[in-house]
Amino acid sequence: MAETQGKVITCKAAVVWGPKVPLVIQEICVDPPQKMEVRVKILYSSICHTDLGCWNGTNEAERAFPRILGHEAVGIVESVGEGVKDVKEGDYVIPTFNGECGECKVCKREESNLCERYHVDPMKRVMVNDGGTRFSTTINKDGGSSQSQPIYHFLNTSTFTEYTVLDSACVVKIDPNSPLKQMSLLSCGVSTGVGAAWNIANVKEGKSTAVFGLGSVGLAVAEGARARGASRIIGVDANASKFEKGKLMGVTDFINPKDLTKPVHQMIREITGGGVDYSFECTGNVDVLREAFLSTHVGWGSTVLVGIYPTPRTLPLHPMELFDGRRITGSVFGGFKPKSQLPNFAQQCMKGVVKLEPFITNELPFEKINDAFQLLRDGKSLRCILQISKLLKR
């Protein structure tokens, strides 16, 4: 890749030009990385509901177009900017939307993974260095003239492109012999779910759990709880078609709210003798959050917020409901510090501690990205892997 270092690269990217507008595969220019930045050739990328939410324009504050979405991927370092020491040309890496500088007070503490400078920020659309973008395209103006049009970044990553530029804090080196398609899942969904069970709730062997929402993240929570030896994993979802997949992730009981004549939390309390030890809310619905909280056992029950909440509604709890010892906490990227902890997690996945294969339900070429979005919208896909670039040799 030496022939492209320090030069602008012209490549293909899927650009979204407005809410709910089909993505356009088009030619863009990708600038060289600046200080503490890395330019990566993307090999595979998958689609997450967060991509879908931004494409939908669900949160007006997040709207910024044109934009390159995508944040779950795996790729090869093409070149690095000044000061980058931990990765080099040819390294296999995964991008992470939540970075780790290793220098700030948060990175130096065990209690949090929210780096002061590179933590996840859905409103962020430019690079930290200079407040500019590294993507652009040419648009035609009236009268036949043309001009360069900047294209915004997304979640510190932007992976629906053959080449992307990231802050080095958001690039994690992985084993070159790892299964690349599966490794892309660690950029978001699987790490977020498994980490919520391992790092945030700290699920113990023999304990009971309830997972509300059996999408990719919810199933990853279940898989994490299974790997930790949970004796009972209750899956809650209104889509009965998800239950079969849940069995592969260790779910022992299934509840479809549509089949009940009583609140879900009441049913869970009845079948568990008072409530579960841990509950996980993975839908981003505050009403479901209340059910998840009330499904935990008085005195020690713990509820973890994993879903994204786009609405301005507040937490539907009375302070006295916390008085009895139940807890509620949030989770970002499963509590994983990406650079210092994700490589070990990847090794555990390679050893089979966590099963990654069942999460990949579809594979499509890059040019079929709009079909992949439709599969997710229709609930027919957990993770659809897109081949962005060809891997010539390994």
Swiss-Prot record:
Origin: domain of life: Eukaryota
This protein's UniProt keywords: Cytoplasm, Metal-binding, NAD, Oxidoreductase, Zinc
Protein family per UniProt: Belongs to the zinc-containing alcohol dehydrogenase family. Class-III subfamily.
UniProt entry tagged with the keyword Transferase: no
Residues annotated as binding an alcohol: T50, H71
CDD domains linked to this entry: alcohol_DH_plants (cd08301)
Metal-binding is among the record's keywords: yes
Catalytic activity entry: a primary alcohol + NAD(+) = an aldehyde + NADH + H(+); a secondary alcohol + NAD(+) = a ketone + NADH + H(+)
Locations listed in the record: Cytoplasm
Positions that bind Zn(2+) 2: C101, C104, C107, C115
Residues reported to bind Zn(2+) 1: C48, T50, H71, C188
UniProt-recorded name of the protein: Alcohol dehydrogenase-like 3
Cofactor: Zn(2+)
Binding site for NAD(+): 50, 213-218, 237, 242, 283, 306-308, 333, 383
PANTHER family reported for this sequence: ALCOHOL DEHYDROGENASE, ALCOHOL DEHYDROGENASE-LIKE 3
One GO location term (cellular component): cytoplasm
EC number, UniProt record: 1.1.1.1
Record SUPFAM superfamilies: GroES-like, NAD(P)-binding Rossmann-fold domains
Subunit structure: Homodimer.
Pfam families registered for this protein in UniProt: ADH_N (PF08240), ADH_zinc_N (PF00107)
Main enzyme class: oxidoreductase
UniProt xrefs under InterPro entries: ADH-like_C, ADH-like_N, ADH_Zn_CS, GroES-like_sf, NAD(P)-bd_dom_sf
